[in-house]
Amino acid sequence: PSELESFIRTLDRFFEQLQTASHAGDPTLLEHYFAHCNTDAISFADLVRALCHTRLWRGFEVSDNPYPKLCQDFAQSVEHGSQIMQPEPAYHSRAHFKDVCLALSALASQVSFIGEGEEFDQQWQLSSEDWWILLFCAIAHDYGHPGTRNQTPFELEKYAVELTQEFLLRHAYPLFKIKALMADLEPIVLATDPRYFETLSAQFLNHMHPNKREDVMALLLVEADLCASTLPQRGMYLGEQLAKEWEPSDSKLAQIVESDAGRTRFLEGIAFYSPHARQLHIETIRLKSIQELKAN
């Protein structure tokens, strides 16, 4: 079998393990998943190609499904954009794009466990097409990221949205479809601005009414964006990468971000609300990491 085929099989095995293993709060399986599947041997475009061919993603059926080809072409475009950016940002690199697509897939692997029950459970039930739109958003969310920080709210996220629209226009995707996809994509990608997290999470802490589909999708992308950074080993490494990225512009902040105190503050400032993340015990892992850091 080709390298790609054996990689697809590896991904299939991981999704199966994530569905069956009882790994209550033990980060080992997720650490292994990211370490094993996010290697330099596999390009970002190949990773997306492989994901589109897994049993998991093939199971999200859409009639005349345009998304697998669209996601693969888009990943190639994003990959090319990163290749010509020299040097590539230490954290917001293709490795981060891979992490987010892998994390979103891990969340997607839990759909069969999401309750059909009450109104609040139903808000979490997305259509197959919604999941494909989320994968497209995961590829888009940091497109063209120069490794700087937002000077104004949503600055870099808006740039990613613009580049995504340019890609769709270049690829002669039908205009009415571009309009619909961009209407979904824009609020979801903008929600990944770290400063928006408090606003977004407030909607999920307030149990007065179920959340809109757009908010549920935004939350799942944000959780995918944060997932790898929450793991004890991978998270430490990613903190070091972020420090390298920030060093030229703000060395003080760079020192904080890779310190134990900085990591504790980061972990205390986030949380995981979706039942998909809870099924994977990411919230338990976050709380345990905080305890361990404070015990040091």
What is each model feature region?
Residues 1-57, 106-129, 140, 144-152, ...:
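Divalent metal-dependent phosphate-bond-processing catalytic cores, especially two-metal-ion Mg2+/Mn2+ enzymes
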Residues 32-34, 74-103, 144-148:
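Active-site flanking loop/helix segments enriched in acidic
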Residues 57-69, 79:
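Low-complexity, highly charged intrinsically disordered N-terminal segments
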Residues 92-99, 130-131, 155-159:
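Aromatic- and histidine-enriched alpha-helix N-cap/loop-to-helix transition segments
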